[in-house]
Amino acid sequence: MISAEPSASRVEQYAVEAAAAYFVEPSDVMGTGRTVTFVKARRALWRRLADEGFSTSSIARAVGRHHTTVRHALKS
């Protein structure tokens, strides 16, 4: 597991890619909306960062969420 924080540019790039894959805006991926497509795109972003070895805490800090929110999303 990587202890460092994901860079803002990496998070932004992955958010753009997740948004394109789910046909939403990057701001929706980084936002708080609970529409199914927003949630799926957000989960895809978090999963990609987790697959690269970032901890749920570091992902949460990078996207402005609580680490348990990220952990719960990655369980499903």
Give the ranges of each region predicted by the language model.
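Residues within well-ordered alpha helices
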Residues: 17-18, 48
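General nucleic-acid-binding
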Residues: 1-17
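Short, amphipathic alpha-helical "recognition" segments used to contact nucleic acids or chromatin
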Residues: 37-54
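Short alpha-helical "recognition helix" segments of helix-turn-helix
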Residues: 57-62
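DNA major-groove recognition helix of helix-turn-helix
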Residues: 50, 63, 74
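The DNA-contacting recognition helix of HTH DNA-binding domains
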Residues: 66-67
